[in-house]
């Protein structure tokens, strides 16, 4: 699979600009049907709102992009929202910004800043993760070797998983695919060649983007 970025979790972030309420709803989605279902659900829930503008991006290559101004002046809502998602390189995500008009007009520039700002604030508060594939490495150690294993892991910043204690110690680590070779080399050198290891099935992980 190709690595991609998306939001850490679904979320809602609200702010007030010149007495208008802007509520940004964000959701992780994987299909256009799911995205539109989410958007329509917000519209139904907030049917009394002045506008429910939306944008979403789908696909590992960000190949599907859609946006809607939902009655706001053309180009002042959906596209600015979409641009924020693009600038953060996010995909498999949908955003709806619900506006409750407060009586003060913002003008085209003000609307663009408000809708883009609502999504930017939501992305910042919700957080971003990189979704990627990591390779598994199964390691078999003697009990004496396992006593030193934590020191080796700490040097490389690795965690152990599914550790089993039988006549020997069987444990797992996961690393980015480009780090498999150097990790195996490091492991072999640490134990002076007296260690058994093999690559196993990969897993999908979500790494926070700081």
Predicted regions and their residues:
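C-terminal regulatory domains involved in ligand/effector binding and gene-expression control
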Residues: 1-75, 180, 198-210
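Structural motif
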Residues: 24-25, 54, 92-95, 136, ...
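Hydrophobic side chains in well-ordered alpha-helices
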Residues: 35-38, 115, 149-152, 183-186
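Active-site beta-strand/loop microenvironment that shapes enzyme catalytic pockets
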Residues: 77-125
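Short glycine-/aliphatic-rich beta-strand segments at the starts of folded cytosolic domains
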Residues: 127-143
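Short amphipathic alpha-helix segments
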Residues: 140-158
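Conserved short beta-strand edge segments in small beta-sheet-based binding/regulatory domains
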Residues: 160-165, 191-207
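Terminal, non-globular segments
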Residues: 173-180
């Amino acid at each position: 699979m190709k690595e991609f970025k998306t939001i850490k979790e679904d979320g809602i972030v609200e702010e007030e600009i010149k007495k208008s309420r802007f509520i940004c709803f964000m959701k992780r989605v994987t299909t256009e049907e799911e995205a539109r279902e989410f958007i329509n659900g917000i519209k139904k829930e907030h049917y009394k709102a002045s506008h429910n503008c939306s944008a979403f991006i789908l696909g590992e290559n960000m190949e599907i992009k859609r946006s809607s101004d939902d009655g706001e002046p053309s180009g002042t809502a959906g596209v600015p929202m979409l641009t924020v998602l693009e600038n953060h390189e996010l995909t498999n995500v949908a955003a709806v910004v619900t506006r409750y008009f407060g009586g003060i007009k913002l003008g085209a520039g003000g609307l663009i800043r408000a809708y883009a700002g609502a999504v930017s604030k939501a992305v910042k508060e919700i957080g971003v993760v990189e979704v990627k594939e990591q390779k598994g490495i199964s390691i078999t150690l003697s009990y004496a070797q396992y006593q030193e294993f934590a020191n080796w892991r700490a040097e490389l910043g690795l965690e152990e998983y599914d550790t089993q204690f039988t006549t020997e110690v069987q444990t797992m680590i996961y690393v980015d695919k480009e780090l498999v070779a150097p990790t195996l080399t490091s492991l072999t050198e640490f134990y002076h060649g007296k260690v058994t290891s093999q690559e196993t099935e990969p897993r999908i992980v979500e790494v926070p983007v700081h």
